[in-house]
């Protein structure tokens, strides 16, 4: 199948970014083409790039079901069997943007030649449009995602989530999620976003569970850059560190209750791809403190609110009190307290 006319039409429409899987294509020198291992990686990388306001072309060698996602920049997918009736890619991108959806069209149609347009698009934070729904309102006491989002919110990072408990980073007090398309999408979406906005590598991260990692997304991320935080809840026998190394990312490994270490890892300057593995049991399955709980010393507490910004259900009040019945004993509150007012309960 020949994609030459479709690619030329996309370039003329201001598209300078292509994610291709199973499709051979030639592109102008200043059009960046990323080869993806699978269609899933290509599509969600394109959605991440769209978040940056860019027009993005996806070229697939097979027909797949496309996600029902909103877009900022237009996303056009060339794949066999697609029936989109467009005169050219300019019209397809305009339809994607006005319809707020991904559009699909045939790769080998006789698209008309058009005058070239420059690349356009700007990023705007719109979590209400791009974060998947989550029925729960707060993390459990001891949740291993808590320290990650505490640090992300403190550092004002642009953050892409995944599914499951990673969606709780969009709730109060964190409000740290910019986008989340569901399980198994965060790494690919991060790669797409940083491909579209290379200057965002230093202040953009994605958060995903260890079970959601795919080799294709990690290999793409190793090309584009960005920080991927992998929360390993120790539910299975996978080896996320080994998978990262095979894909060219040397991981930093930390415990979930090491809040200050997580913050330091996310604060570190980097212009490439990084993986931060945060290990901790799921709080629903394991009471992390093994009977240990914490309490506040009212004589030392300065009411600074640092422990409250963890969003732990066990902590309440302006002069914080820790409910021993709810406390999981993770010790994150003691780690963020700067005046040593939180200690292990005797």
PLM regions and their residue ranges:
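Conserved thiamine diphosphate
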Residues: 71-109, 199, 234-265
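Thiamine diphosphate
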Residues: 17, 24-96, 163-235
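Redox cofactor-anchoring modules in respiratory/redox and cofactor-processing assemblies
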Residues: 190, 241, 255, 259-302, ...
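Phosphate/pyrophosphate-binding active-site segments
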Residues: 116-150, 251-258, 264, 273-279
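Flexible loop/turn segments at secondary-structure boundaries
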Residues: 25-27, 43, 65-66, 109-112, ...
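Terminal amphipathic helices with adjacent charged low-complexity linkers/tails
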Residues: 97, 101-128, 345
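Active-site diphosphate/adenylate-binding microenvironment
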Residues: 3, 14, 24, 127-187
């Amino acid at each position: 199948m020949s994609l030459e006319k479709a690619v030329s039409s996309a370039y003329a429409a201001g598209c300078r970014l292509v994610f291709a899987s199973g499709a051979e294509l030639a592109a102008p020198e200043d059009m960046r083409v990323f080869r993806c291992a699978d269609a899933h990686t290509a599509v969600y990388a394109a959605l991440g790039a769209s978040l940056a306001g860019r027009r993005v072309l996806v070229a697939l060698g097979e027909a797949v079901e496309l996600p029902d996602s909103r877009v900022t920049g237009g996303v056009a997918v060339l794949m066999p069997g697609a029936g989109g009736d467009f005169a050219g890619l300019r019209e397809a991108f305009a339809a994607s943007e006005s319809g707020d959806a991904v559009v699909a069209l045939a790769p080998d149609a006789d698209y008309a030649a058009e005058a070239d347009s420059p690349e356009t698009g700007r990023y705007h934070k719109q979590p209400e449009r791009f974060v998947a729904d989550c029925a729960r309102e707060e993390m459990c006491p001891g949740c291993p995602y808590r320290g990650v989002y505490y640090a992300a919110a403190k550092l004002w990072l642009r953050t892409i989530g995944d599914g499951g408990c990673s969606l709780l980073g969009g709730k109060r007090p964190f409000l740290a999620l910019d986008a989340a398309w569901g399980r198994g999408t965060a790494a690919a979406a991060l790669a797409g976003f940083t491909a579209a906005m290379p200057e965002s590598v230093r202040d953009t991260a994605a958060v995903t569970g260890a079970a959601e990692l795919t080799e294709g997304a990690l290999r793409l991320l190793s090309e584009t850059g960005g920080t991927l935080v992998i929360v390993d809840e120790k539910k299975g026998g996978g080896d996320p560190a080994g998978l990262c190394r095979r894909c060219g990312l040397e991981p930093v490994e930390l415990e979930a209750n090491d809040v200050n270490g997580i913050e330091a890892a996310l604060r570190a300057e980097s212009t490439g791809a990084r993986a931060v593995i945060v290990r901790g049991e799921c709080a629903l399955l394991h009471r992390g403190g093994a009977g240990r709980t914490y309490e506040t010393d009212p004589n030392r507490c300065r009411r600074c609110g640092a422990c409250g910004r963890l969003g732990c259900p066990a902590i309440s009040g302006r002069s914080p009190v820790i409910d021993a019945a709810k406390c999981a004993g993770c010790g994150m509150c003691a780690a963020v307290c700067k005046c040593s007012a939180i200690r292990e309960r005797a």
